[in-house]
Amino acid sequence: MRATVILVLWLSALAVSAAQTRSVFPGTLDQHPAIDYKNATAADPASQLQRVVEGGAPLTFEGEQGYLRAVLSRLNVPVESQILVFSKTGIQHPFTGPENPRALYFNDRVVVGYIPGAPLIEMASHDPRQGVMFRTLAQDASRAAFARPDRCISCHLSSNSLDVPGILVRSMSTAADGRPMPQDGSFVIDHRAPLEQRWA
């Protein structure tokens, strides 16, 4: 009984603390000065790669895969980590589907996304201060151009990521062409999710 009371009091204190934080700082936490997501100098692996390339270091462009192998090599992301996403999700969703899945490669700090025929390589890279930073690299042999599109956080900034930019894995029903069908329900996936929710 005593343990239950202590747990309830502790959870209540957390709720009050969260409410106080929200009332002191209106807006999403990515805008908080401690994070300053859009303006602070980033120190994540993808931003470091961007600075090196923009400083003059070459990035090899190879055939249909473009910069993919060079990016994986520079970021120490193993090719063997590949997983495939068959749904039409992400900022390049028109290019993905059951016949042309998005390949994701990852290590402990970076996720690299590649879609055959798509104009961009996608990167989600962990910064020790700002959290997950989202970048793209144009598949243009004449110039390795990096960008930080705001539209990534339209999905990757929510209560599911604790109101800061973060990685989100969700399982949901899809139509035959890969279009998501959220009306049929969805599950946010992490290490606690039961196997029957990880089917999509």
What is each PLM-predicted segment?
Residues V5-A15:
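Bacterial N-terminal signal peptides
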Residues V16-S17, C152:
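A generic alpha-helix preference that emphasizes hydrophobic side chains
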Residues T96-P98, R135:
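Short, conserved acidic/polar surface loops in the N-terminal third of protein domains
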Residues V111-A200:
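Sequence context surrounding c-type heme c attachment/ligation sites in exported
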